[in-house]
């Protein structure tokens, strides 16, 4: 019966997953139908606009060329008409001289003949007919204004839709996730010299496998990529995976997106568990601030709840002006809250295997600050590093400045400048807990031990504040140092 029940549960789970996939696909099909209508209307509108632009351009060219013909015809007509008028006048003058010369020749016996002959000779010399060019000033040939649009007609006949770039193919073998950076590499299935740039889109997700259509996280867009690879830097991996897709663009149009891929982005994510914190610590997600009145405010509220001390605080009293620490639900319960001089707060995520890395930046003016790890069983009165259940690096700015590594109430003074940002690397299976200058990755100290219980990130602060950064991968520099064995030293054995 139990086996049948378990088999039925598996069937139900399989059906539920399949139903979700089908629903997602139905949503995709409906969205595609809407997109087909919208996109076809858009491209039809664009096509009509392009042809209208061509019609307008051809009409403008036609008007301009007709105007050129009309201007050339008017200019030639004007020149020929002027030349015709001049020739007509010259011909009339020449005919008059010819008639006069014939008449004078017939009157050779007249005593006026010599004088008349001389006048005719002088008239011929000055006659327009002998100064007139008998070559037309312009040609009647209009061949320079003829056109042959055969080539252009062929070009118009060759009009077609733009060639769309092929969808790129993302090369998972060459892509890399490391140091909170993602290098994505892709290639084109066919050589295309007209590609101008690429567009990369990515988003965070907690779901493995093909990207889902309905996601809470939006696609982030990077445009103008000229190469077939791109590196995203300075990422915070606060989700388990990232989706990626790429499309190619030429000068006019973008192609289809590549098949989306999902890359795993392993990193250690946790928040501070406010329910474990000392009452003098004001906890807000990943930051902590010392609150000297925190405990007193809680005591006042507790008495008011019990019906004791119902007298209201003065309007300007610290108790009224200081808010209580922010609380978060946790399995530890209120009874396990750190108290007395253990100004401690723990992370909310257990470390029970693998390698993990996080960083913490503390206020340099803090009188005391500590960072490390602890077993969940760390007592509520116990301070970090003073029991066998915790390991930490401790900075003390009160009275005398000190920078120490602490475990099981043993202390090692560190001979190194105190950085304002510390990196913590925990390799659970190897039993290594290393502290680094987060900026330079200089090793400050390494505990080498054997962890017998799951660990929690642990922090302590007195009269100060700090900010934790999670979602970080183990830096490559840290891995290299660990492989070379330079992260350990014989002097650390006394604190294991």
From Swiss-Prot:
Nucleus in keyword set: yes
Effect of residue 322 to A: In mitosis, remained associated with microtubules
GO biological process: cell division; cytoplasmic microtubule organization; regulation of cell division; regulation of cytokinesis; regulation of mitotic spindle organization
One term of GO molecular function: identical protein binding
Cellular component annotations (GO), alphabetically ordered: centrosome; cleavage furrow; cytosol; microtubule; nucleus
Domain Fibronectin type-III: from-to ranges: 164-268
Pfam families: fn3 (PF00041), SPRY (PF00622)
Annotated stretches, region: Disordered: 301-336
Effect of residue 317 to A: In mitosis, remained associated with microtubules
Domain of life: Eukaryota
Effect of residue 317 to D: Reduced ability to associate with microtubules
Coiled coil region boundaries: 4-99
Residue span(s) of domain B30.2/SPRY: 268-477
Keywords in alphabetical order: Cell cycle, Cell division, Coiled coil, Cytoplasm, Cytoskeleton, Methylation, Microtubule, Mitosis, Nucleus
Annotated ranges, domain COS: 105-162
Tissue spec. comment: Highly expressed in brain tissues, including cerebellum, cerebral cortex, medulla, occipital pole, frontal lobe, temporal lobe and putamen. Lower expression in spinal cord.
Subunit structure: Oligomerization is required for binding to microtubules.
Function according to Swiss-Prot or TrEMBL: May be involved in microtubule organization and stabilization.
Domain text: B30.2 box contains a microtubule-binding site.
Name by which UniProt lists this protein: Fibronectin type III and SPRY domain-containing protein 1
């Amino acid at each position: 019966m139990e086996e049948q029940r378990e088999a039925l549960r598996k069937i139900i789970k399989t059906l539920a997953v399949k139903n979700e996939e089908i629903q997602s696909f139905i949503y995709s099909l409906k969205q595609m139908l809407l997109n087909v209508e919208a996109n076809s209307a858009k491209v039809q509108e664009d096509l009509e606009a392009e042809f209208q632009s061509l019609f307008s351009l051809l009409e403008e060219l036609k008007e301009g060329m007709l105007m050129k013909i009309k201007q050339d015809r008017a200019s030639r007509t004007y020149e020929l008409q002027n030349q015709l008028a001049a020739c007509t006048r010259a011909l009339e003058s020449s005919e008059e001289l010819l008639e006069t010369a014939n008449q004078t020749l017939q009157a050779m016996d007249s005593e006026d003949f010599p004088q008349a002959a001389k006048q005719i000779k002088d008239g011929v010399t000055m006659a327009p007919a002998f100064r007139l060019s008998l070559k037309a000033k312009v040609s009647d040939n209009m061949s320079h204004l003829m056109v042959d649009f055969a080539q252009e007609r062929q070009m118009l006949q060759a009009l077609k839709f733009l060639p769309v770039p092929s969808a790129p193919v993302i090369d998972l073998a060459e892509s890399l996730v490391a140091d909170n950076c993602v290098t994505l590499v892709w290639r084109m299935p066919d050589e295309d010299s007209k590609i101008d740039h690429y567009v990369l889109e990515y988003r965070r997700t907690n779901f493995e496998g093909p990207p889902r259509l309905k996601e809470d996280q939006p696609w982030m867009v990077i445009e103008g990529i000229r190469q077939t690879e791109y590196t995203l830097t300075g990422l915070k991996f606060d989700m388990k995976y990232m989706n990626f897709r790429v499309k190619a663009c030429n000068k006019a149009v973008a192609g289809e997106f590549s098949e989306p891929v999902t890359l795993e982005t392993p990193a250690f994510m946790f928040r501070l568990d406010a329910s474990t914190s000392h009452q003098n610590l004001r906890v807000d997600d990943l930051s902590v601030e010392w609150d000297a009145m925190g405990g007193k405010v809680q005591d006042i509220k507790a008495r008011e709840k019990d019906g004791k001390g119902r007298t209201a605080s003065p309007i300007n009293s610290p108790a009224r002006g200081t808010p209580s620490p922010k609380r978060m639900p946790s399995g530890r319960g209120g009874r396990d809250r750190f108290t007395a001089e253990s100004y401690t707060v723990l992370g909310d995520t257990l470390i029970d295997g693998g390698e993990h890395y996080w960083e913490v930046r503390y206020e340099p003016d803090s009188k005391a600050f500590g960072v490390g790890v602890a077993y969940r069983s760390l007592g509520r009165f116990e301070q970090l590093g003073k029991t066998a259940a915790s390991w930490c690096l401790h900075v003390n700015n009160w009275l005398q400045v000190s920078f120490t590594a602490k475990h099981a109430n043993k202390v090692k003074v560190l001979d190194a400048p105190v950085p304002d940002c510390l990196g913590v690397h925990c390799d659970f299976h190897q039993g290594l807990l290393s502290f680094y200058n987060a900026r330079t990755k200089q090793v400050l100290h390494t505990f080498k031990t054997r962890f017998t219980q799951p660990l929690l990130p642990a922090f302590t602060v007195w009269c100060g504040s700090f900010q934790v950064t999670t979602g970080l991968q183990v830096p490559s520099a840290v891995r290299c140092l660990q492989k070379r064995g330079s992260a350990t030293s014989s002097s650390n054995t006394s604190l294991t």
